[in-house]
UniProtKB/Swiss-Prot annotation:
Keywords: ATP-binding, Cell membrane, Membrane, Nucleotide-binding, Phosphate transport, Translocase, Transport. It is a peripheral membrane protein. Coiled coil: none annotated. The gene is pstB. Its main location: membrane. Residues 5-247 form the ABC transporter domain. CDD domains: ABC_PstB_phosphate_transporter (cd03260). Belongs to the ABC transporter superfamily. Phosphate importer (TC 3.A.1.7) family. One of its GO terms (cellular component) is plasma membrane. This is Phosphate import ATP-binding protein PstB. It is an enzyme of class 7 (translocase). One of its GO terms (biological process) is phosphate ion transmembrane transport. Pfam families: ABC_tran. ATP binds at G37, P38, S39, G40, C41, G42, K43, S44.
Amino acid sequence: MATRIDVSGLTAYYGKFKAVADVNLTIEPKNVTAFIGPSGCGKSTVLRTLNRMHEVLPGARVEGQVLLDGEDLYGPGMDPVAVRRTVGMVFQRPNPFPTMSIYENVIAGLKLNGVRKKALLDERVEESLRGANLWEEVKDRLGRPGAGLSGGQQQRLCIARAIAVEPQVLLMDEPCSALDPISTLAIEDLIAKLKSSFTIVIVTHNMQQASRVSDSTAFFSLEKTGDPGRLVEYDKTSQIFSNPKEKRTEDYISGRFG
């Protein structure tokens, strides 16, 4: 079952620098939520707090709560590795493991989780590649390097790798920014398909993409460079793009700044 995410009073730091302040929002299950806003507004930081990926940077910490179906992501005894199994992530640039085959890329997380049976691995590889709309393109060359695929195929391979461990949430940090328009369309079509099984949160600088793929949109901004980013407005995407409540939101989506 896809997961609901409740964020309350979230403030994120990198050392002494306050990157984002007092974020409150609820992300509904099996929806696509887009995070938009100018560079430096904290949208990617908020995304990374949803599976504790920000903690890979020294001095990173958070205040507030992130609840996954009521369970505190930052509660005592919560294992970040277990969190990342539940909340998968796809990064800005396709990052297949360069020395691994397509098959090995997909099963990498499964093997880390202790799955060893060949029949189960084979089944999960096909399921995941089909889920990522990639199976028909690679089924006859699973033993070849994943890095030999095109950029768009590599990104879909990374999505297959992420969904192979059966997460409930998929985070996508500008997943199309390094791709050509045709590959971007393929990823957008895939996102529309995946939301029937996963809660999806996507960071994007592309306003048209946000309006096309998302059900809800969160607009983040900041007063000036060096200030913490803040959530300005969060609503259904149709509302944000047709009748935003905040002037800053309207100015941003209409291209007046950012």
